[in-house]
């Protein structure tokens, strides 16, 4: 499959969420590409979300150098001179169209989503585009 990462690519088609994380298509697994995911440094996720009966939805992004061991996106928070590192999860608590920018420089990227609460009438589509900033 040939993918131009500079154009939005659907990595999760519209579907109801479950209460466990379900991974979308892993970016970087394609073969025969002229460019690789790690040749870009920005990932933009375009998320169309319908909350239905859910309390919220959660999205996590994981990175891998080898498509085997994945490491969840994290952020740092300073607290009284101590640097604390936390895994990062994006929580969506209302129906909407969301744009999530993510810095990256990894060979493989996996995006997963789940719902919290009752999944009835929920839906999520995720598109990804890569670029250089």
List the predicted regions and their residue ranges.
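Surface-exposed loop/edge segments in extracytoplasmic proteins
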Residues: 6, 67-76
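Noncatalytic modules at the cell exterior or secretory-pathway interfaces
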Residues: 41-47, 101-122
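Solvent-exposed, flexible loop/coil segments flanking beta-strands in beta-rich domains
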Residues: 2-39
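Conserved Ser/Thr-centered positions that define the repeating blades of beta-propeller domains
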Residues: 62-64
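Exposed low-complexity, polar/acidic, P/S/T/G-rich flexible segments that act as propeptides
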Residues: 121-133
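Short coil-to-beta strand junction motifs in C2/discoidin
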Residues: 54-59
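Solvent-exposed serine/threonine-rich low-complexity stretches and specific carbohydrate-binding patches
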Residues: 73-90
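Extracellular and analogous surface-interaction loops
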Residues: 29-41, 51-52, 100-104
